[in-house]
Swiss-Prot record:
Keywords: Cell wall, Glycoprotein, GPI-anchor, Lipoprotein, Membrane, Secreted, Signal
Provenance organism: Saccharomyces cerevisiae (strain ATCC 204508 / S288c)
Top-level taxonomy: Eukaryota, Fungi, Dikarya, Ascomycota, Saccharomycotina
UniProt KW Secreted keyword: yes
Protein name, UniProt field: Cell wall protein DAN1
Recorded topology in the membrane: Lipid-anchor; GPI-anchor
Length: 298
């Protein structure tokens, strides 16, 4: 019986050693890993309470879930109190104190090893990260290519538009120039045609008549010069005491210039009389001047 007992004890020891050597690999964010980390963290707070108080006084923004305070003073029975804390919050708290690397990290590693737990980033997370990086790189490349293509297209479009605008401007300029030349040519042609028509259809012939309209103001004399069939006639109307007499006589071509001069002189005198008849004794000066001019033709 003793041999059986010894063998049984030996088998139990071997089984225990085998069980202890079995390691379970878990994610750092697994709940069992988080609970082990929190257990070490709470125990460290209880053992170094004054350090944590001083740290919290210097870092007002470092907050702790109320479950941590309850666990510290629970006397070691706090496992169920910490199940609601997220993995990100656990990581923030344990790595936020200055003694994490010198004291907490080693204690957490030892506690995980005692439980047969090894932590590693899951393959799916790595693949997802790699895939995300690859997709991001591909998207960036595609975006860059798209941007370059868009920029090139915009540049080509702008160049094409500029070319079209330039061509349109050139065409418009050509059309405007052509239209201007056409209008100028048409106007010149019309002017030339009018001049030609005037020269051919309205020559100064012996049958045309030229007249000088008389100017009569306040009963003063007036002179009318008419040209008919190359003959110059001079008509002189003289008025005195409301009785007027008219004399018409032909003059030679030599006298024509004289008659024209008389007409011009008479017109000037009449103009003066018109501008102020009362200033010249009711036109007496004007009548005398016309009579004197008419005497030159007799």
């Amino acid at each position: 019986m003793s041999r059986i007992s010894i063998l049984a004890v030996a088998a139990a020891l071997v089984a225990s050693a085998t069980a202890a050597s079995v390691t379970t690999t878990l994610s750092p964010y697994d709940e069992r890993v988080n609970l082990i980390e929190l257990a070490v963290y709470v125990s460290d707070i209880g053992a170094h309470l004054s350090e944590y108080y001083a740290f919290q006084a210097l870092h007002k923004t470092e907050t702790y879930p109320p479950e941590i305070a309850k666990a510290v003073f629970a006397g070691g029975d706090f496992t169920t109190m910490l199940t609601g804390i997220s993995g990100d919050e656990v990581t923030r708290m344990i790595t936020g104190v200055p003694w994490y690397s010198t004291r907490l990290m080693g204690a957490i590693s030892e506690a995980l090893a005692n439980e047969g737990i090894a932590t590693a980033v899951p393959a799916s997370t790595t693949e997802a990260s790699s895939t995300s990086t690859s997709e991001a790189s591909s998207a960036a490349t595609e975006s860059s290519s798209s941007s370059e293509s868009s920029a090139e297209t915009s540049s080509n479009a702008a160049s094409t538009q500029a070319t079209v605008s330039s061509e349109s401007s050139s065409a418009a300029s050509t059309i405007a120039s052509s239209a201007e030349s056409s209008v100028a040519s048409s106007v010149a042609s019309s002017v030339a045609s009018s001049a030609s028509f005037a020269n051919t259809t309205a020559p100064v012939s012996s049958t045309s008549s030229i007249s000088v309209t008389p100017v009569v103001q306040n009963g003063t004399d007036s002179t009318v010069t008419k040209t008919q069939a190359s003959t110059v006639e001079t008509t002189i109307t003289s008025c005195s005491n409301n009785v007027c007499s008219t004399v018409t006589k032909p003059v030679s071509s030599k006298a024509q210039s004289t008659a024209t001069s008389v007409t011009s002189s008479a017109s000037r005198v009449i103009d003066v009389t018109t501008n102020g008849a009362n200033k010249f004794n009711n036109g007496v000066f004007g009548a005398a001047a016309i009579a004197g001019a008419a005497a030159l033709l007799l």
